[in-house]
From Swiss-Prot:
InterPro entries in the cross-refs: AICAR_Tfase_dup_dom_sf, Cytidine_deaminase-like, MGS-like_dom, MGS-like_dom_sf, PurH-like
Organism the protein comes from: Prochlorococcus marinus (strain MIT 9313)
One BP annotation, GO: 'de novo' IMP biosynthetic process
Keyword hit for Hydrolase: yes
Protein name: Bifunctional purine biosynthesis protein PurH
UniProt entry tagged with the keyword Membrane: no
This enzyme's EC code(s): 2.1.2.3, 3.5.4.10
Gene name for this UniProt entry: purH
Length: 517
């Protein structure tokens, strides 16, 4: 009797070459159903339909196709077991030797935020996981393939005989496949049925192993959902991404998205913006008339720190922008797109990592912010709620003028992306000084004001948290700051407001804190 391979896949990439090799080179009978069977038949391969094999027609609009003893008995039977052999003979069930199954695209379906409940439910696979689990359980006798990237390795092994080690590895990957699938379903349903945290975090597949972690002695790996967030990024050139690259890219992208992100239509950037990041903190941020102008201003904000930095741009990179990018050493650049001439210019920097990240991939990513602690993880919403200046209050006697209001809004967009304690000095849509990560707020203010230097006069200052004392505001006033924005809420707010009034500064309270740890 010819060996049997059962093929039923949602992702049909590589299925025809696999089936051709199984049938023509290794003598397998091909058993299939639905769309997979049609693809194989259209390729000229002889296929036995599952309905023909079982003698039972597909029912319930295709919901029941493979859930049948003649399928599962063939998968689960242990070769050489006398009782199993008797059952197979009595019920005329031929053994199935290879199971090639991947599941309905549930994760991809629910990546669309507008997906209906009914559509999502119809993309929950039932028969597929049952076959995968059955084959994985009986891996001593059945090889189970759940991903196209396994096909070539399996065919090479098949020529010499599939050993126990490969069968076990394939079984492990199969159980990982179904486990991740079930977690994705429960996570999605939980998010929509309750405001509370889901009982389980979503399973995220391995994308690639990284050279090392934050330091060379640390092992590291990158897990990412396909086509979601950074999983949808295309690396156009440059060296392999590192752990630190990815952390900095995430920080840069989050900051530049404050000003919109995209190249056209509804995804056109609101303001052309550029962000330069070092060690997850923005060291230069600016808006401009065109991406090239924004980049030049962002680099000018702190060219010393920009060396070896990560750049995020929120619009199409043209030749002028590309020339600016090649003017100094940078690690990575991310943008929604690159013009052909820009690609040619940037190609002269062979080690520069270029990433193209479409707005759609960002939209498809979840909003959970996840951090690890010893023995567990912490999950919170992203701090990405839209900023609404109409909800702010003026606490000082003097109100900010229109120019100051624009600067305060810009600085407030930026400060929530700086590590706490965070202080930002800015003017005319450009950061002038950033104070990050100090253990006291006035220390961060000193750093930001020193970096701004003489440019602090007439600029604004933003703080991610309230002022516990009036020392920060007094320091700002002595450096010529004209307006301050902060959450408010300190028992000593009145002291800081009084200093503003004494020096003629405007103070705006947002009522919202933006700590970043």
């Amino acid at each position: 009797m010819a060996p049997i391979a059962l093929l039923s896949v949602s992702n049909k990439h590589g299925i025809v070459p696999l089936a051709e090799s199984l049938h023509r080179m290794h003598g397998f009978q091909l058993l299939s159903s639905g769309g997979t069977a049609k693809v194989l038949e259209d390729a000229g391969l002889p296929v036995t339909r599952v309905a023909e094999h079982t003698g039972a027609a597909e029912i319930l609009g295709g919901r029941v196709k493979t859930l049948h003893p003649r399928v599962h008995g063939g998968i689960l039977a242990m070769r050489g077991d006398p009782d199993h052999e008797v059952d197979l003979e009595q019920h005329q069930i031929p053994p199935i030797d290879v199971v090639v199954v991947n599941l309905y695209p549930f994760r991809e379906t629910v990546a669309n935020p507008q997906v209906s409940w009914e559509t999502a439910i119809e993309n929950i696979d039932i028969g597929g996981p049952a076959m995968v689990r059955a084959a994985a359980k009986n891996h001593a006798h059945v090889a189970v393939l759940t991903r196209p990237d396994q096909y070539d390795r399996f065919l090479v092994a098949l020529s010499d005989g599939v050993d126990d080690q490969l069968r076990r590895e394939l079984a492990l990957e199969a159980f990982e496949h179904t486990a991740a699938y079930d977690v994705a379903i429960s996570h999605w349903m939980g998010e929509r049925l309750t405001e509370q945290a889901s009982q389980w975090l979503e399973a995220i597949p391995l994308r690639q192993r990284l050279r090392y972690g934050e330091n060379p002695h640390q092992h590291a790996a990158w897990y990412s959902a396909p086509q979601q967030g950074w999983g949808g990024a295309i690396q156009l050139q440059g060296k392999e991404l590192s752990t630190n690259n990815l952390l900095d890219l995430e920080a840069a992208l989050a900051t530049v998205r404050e000003f919109g992100y995209g190249t056209e239509g509804a995804q056109q950037a609101v303001q052309d913006a550029a962000v330069v990041v070092k060690h997850t903190n923005p060291c230069g941020v600016a808006i401009g008339t065109g991406v090239a102008s924004a980049l030049s201003r962002a680099l000018d904000a702190d060219r010393v720190s920009a060396f070896g930095g990560i750049v995020a741009l929120n619009g199409l990179v043209d030749a002028t922008t590309a020339r600016e990018l090649t003017s100094l050493f940078l690690e990575c650049v991310v943008a929604p797109g690159f013009e052909p001439e820009a690609r040619e210019i940037l190609a002269t920097k062979a080690n520069l990592r270029l990433l193209e990240l479409a707005p759609g991939a960002i939209d498809a990513a979840g909003r959970d912010h996840i951090r690890t602690i010893l023995g567990g993880v912490l999950v919170q919403d992203q701090d990405d709620q839209s900023i609404d200046p109409t909800s702010w209050t003026v606490a000082s006697k003097r109100s900010p003028n229109a120019e100051e209001n624009a600067d305060l809004t810009f600085a407030w967009r930026l400060v929530r992306h700086v590590r706490s304690n965070a202080i930002v000095v800015a003017r005319a849509g450009q950061s002038l000084g950033v104070g990050a990560g100090q253990m006291n707020r006035v220390g961060s203010a000193r750093l930001a004001l020193e970096a701004a230097g003489d440019q602090a006069r007439g600029a604004v200052l933003a703080s991610d948290g309230f002022f516990p004392f009036d020392d920060t505001v007094r320091l700002a006033a002595n450096h010529g700051i004209c307006a301050v924005i902060q959450p408010g809420g300190s028992k000593r707010d009145a002291d800081s407001i009084a200093v503003c009034d004494d020096f003629g500064l405007a103070m705006v309270l947002t009522g919202k804190r933006h700590f970043l740890h």
